[in-house]
């Protein structure tokens, strides 16, 4: 029996199977062993589905009789390609679409990235300080709240107050600069919103902030700060692969 990873996930108010193309029988079988899937697609291996859930990534046979976890690699001559990373990116896209992100839209949008951020993170502050340069290169940024200190911290509460602001982009910019936080206390709805975003970071297996992924075009995952030119080059490279 597969036991779910102990992640406290507040479920979003959407159908659990909004993006899952599995038969009712297979859904029932994987639910019975604790896999609450919300995105699935055919894997590169015939007869096997890739399933993304709050428990992580699993692979399920088309009849639901066998389940395994881990990375699925494709052999390319002397090299191997981790197809699981690409699938995780797709699953995360599906999840992030339902989150309350703070968006800074590029005037001439070519790419969209989701960035897990913490208002106390120096590299996050650096990225935000250079925000205009990302936007000028056609990169729209959607910020996802991720308190490195956890949800039972003042940082999480402060970030919730930003997400509760009437003008969220302005409030986030002010917080990133250290110029203060919104006066009003965060509501439960705002705390829940930040909780959902924090859970997404745990599902993404964050090693630090800023980290994230492309939300438009071919999948691209990044960890750590990339300056505007590096980010643009990474996105271009990802979109030239196929």
Model region roles, listed by residue range:
Residues 38-43, 104, 143-146, 174-175, ...:
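Surface-exposed patches in mature extracellular/periplasmic domains of secreted proteins
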Residues 93-110:
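A short beta-strand-turn-helix
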Residues 111-119, 123-186, 202, 206-207, ...:
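Structural alpha/beta surface segment adjacent to cysteine/selenocysteine redox centers
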Residues 63-79:
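N-terminal cap/recognition module
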Residues 1-8:
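Sec-dependent signal peptide recognition
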Residues 83-94, 133-135:
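C-terminal low-complexity, charged extensions that often adopt amphipathic alpha-helices
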């Amino acid at each position: 029996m597969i036991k779910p990873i102990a992640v406290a996930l507040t479920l979003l108010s959407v159908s659990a199977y909004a993006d899952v193309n599995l038969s009712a029988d297979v859904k029932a079988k994987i639910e019975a062993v604790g896999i609450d899937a919300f995105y699935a697609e055919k894997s590169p291996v015939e007869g096997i589905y890739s399933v993304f859930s709050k428990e992580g990534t699993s692979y399920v046979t088309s009849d639901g009789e066998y389940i395994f976890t881990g990375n699925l690699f494709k052999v390319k001559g002397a090299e191997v390609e981790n197809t699981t990373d690409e699938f995780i990116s797709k699953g995360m896209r599906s999840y992030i679409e339902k989150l309350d992100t703070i968006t800074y839209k590029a005037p001439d949008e070519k790419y969209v990235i989701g960035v897990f951020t913490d208002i106390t993170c120096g590299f996050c502050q650096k990225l935000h300080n250079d925000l205009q340069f990302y936007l000028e290169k056609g990169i729209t940024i959607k910020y996802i709240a991720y308190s490195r200190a956890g949800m039972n911290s003042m940082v999480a509460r402060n970030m919730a107050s930003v997400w509760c602001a009437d003008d969220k982009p302005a409030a986030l910019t002010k917080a990133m600069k250290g110029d203060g936080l919104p006066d009003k206390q965060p509501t439960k709805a705002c705390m829940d919103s930040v909780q959902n975003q924090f859970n997404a970071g745990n599902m993404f297996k964050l090693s630090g902030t800023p980290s994230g992924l492309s939300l438009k075009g071919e999948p691209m995952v990044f960890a750590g700060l990339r300056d505007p030119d590096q980010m643009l080059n990474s996105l271009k490279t990802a979109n030239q692969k196929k």
